[in-house]
């Protein structure tokens, strides 16, 4: 009888182990923007690729629009293991103590996507991601959103037009310095609160890629948009390091493959999405869109480029020297 009980117990244990082994590995992927933004679309693309390549061994649950965690909460949630994957904007990593990421916030550091990708897809970008590991975070890649432009309820044609205005920014010393250089009053607000703050006059204006301005309906409460394209907004896709290191090697390999393809997808659609959303903003009739003349663009550059020197000691002069040297070097033929 005793032998029978042991046999039954062992069979039940075996069944339990088998059932546990069949449970998929769940990745909770939280972000703060809409599903139809470049990041939102790329997150869904990653979900499909990850689940396909792992043949269902991994299940990705995407939580968009701050439905799981808000701006200020998500990084801590990742470090504690409450969520496994995020794609925060690059400005979020300076307050975390990795100030090298603030290089991406510098105004007019990149003239175009080709220059940007020389950094994000090269050794400099990878070395910056590696600095997250002591924080318990592994960086998997960079996703584009786009180049930011200023919006407000009064016309913006020259730097002085922003003087005295309360401008919403992300928490970033570089962005604070940028706004002060224009005579603006920087106001740090979570992304999910920006629409209401613009609507109620808590802030006068903001800076965003067009996809954010459109999908979050900020254009409904901003009468003017100037295509300054003065700064870049992108994301680092990150994962809890302990979780990542605990995955079977073949699963990591499949997820890396899914991430590489998702990164190519994200960066391919980002500009297209922003161009499409710009046309939608124009057609809405709610926001007047102004294209700067070359002289006006130079005036903004002249006002903002001193921020590079001001922030050099914070970001790291050696890093800035490496970035500038890489940007000045001829591009390698593919």
Predicted features, each with a name:
Residues 1-8:
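Bacterial N-terminal signal peptides that target proteins for export
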Residues 18-20:
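Juxtamembrane cytosolic interface motif at the C-terminal end of transmembrane helices
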Residues 22-115, 123-126, 130-334:
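N-terminal secretory/targeting leader peptides
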